[in-house]
Swiss-Prot record:
Belongs to the SecE/SEC61-gamma family. The keyword Oxidoreductase does not apply. GO terms for molecular function: protein transmembrane transporter activity. It is found in: Cell inner membrane. This is Protein translocase subunit SecE. It comes from the Bacteria. Component of the Sec protein translocase complex. Heterotrimer consisting of SecY, SecE and SecG subunits. The heterotrimers can form oligomers, although 1 heterotrimer is thought to be able to translocate proteins. Interacts with the ribosome. Interacts with SecDF, and other proteins may be involved. Interacts with SecA. The lineage of its organism: Bacteria, Pseudomonadati, Pseudomonadota, Gammaproteobacteria, Enterobacterales. The chain crosses the membrane at residues 17-37, 41-61, 95-115. Keywords: Cell inner membrane, Cell membrane, Membrane, Protein transport, Translocation, Transmembrane, Transmembrane helix, Transport. InterPro entries: SecE_bac, SecE_sf, Translocase_SecE/Sec61-g. One of its GO terms (cellular component) is plasma membrane. It is a multi-pass membrane protein.
Length: 127
């Protein structure tokens, strides 16, 4: 029991160090952008890009980072399995949606006009 608990904590320490270093990279890039605003833009962009790449590279080696990377890879594979519609099918579907929308709006407009005239007629009767 004690050895298992020790091994579990032993694996958590490198994870914590990695996440602390990732946080330091992000905070450092923020402060470099804020404090050195007078330096050339390209130098700041280069330094911040290097820090972000270090943070992303470190994040890939964490358990959560590996899970995120696996999720992205699986999403990409699923996107390749999708059968996307052709241009002609998309155009026909768009025309159908537009025509049905126009037809339904015309029906609603005519019902609204009839109800409006009916209410106006009832109000004009005045008993």
């Amino acid at each position: 029991m004690n050895k298992h608990h020790y091994n579990r904590n032993k694996h958590k320490i490198p994870e914590k160090v990695k996440w602390i270093s990732i946080s330091i990279f992000f905070i450092l890039s923020f402060f470099i952008n804020m404090c050195f605003y007078e330096t050339q833009l390209f130098i700041r962009i280069f330094i911040i890009s290097c820090l972000m790449l270090c943070a992303i590279g470190t994040m890939i080696y964490t358990k959560k980072g590996k899970d995120i990377l696996l999720y992205i890879v699986m999403s990409k594979k699923e996107m390749q399995k999708i059968i996307w519609p052709k241009y002609k099918e998309t155009l026909y579907t768009t025309f159908i949606v537009i025509s049905v929308t126009i037809f339904i709006s015309f029906i609603l407009w005519s019902i609204d006009s009839v109800i409006f005239r009916l209410i106006a007629f009832i109000i004009s009767l005045r008993f």
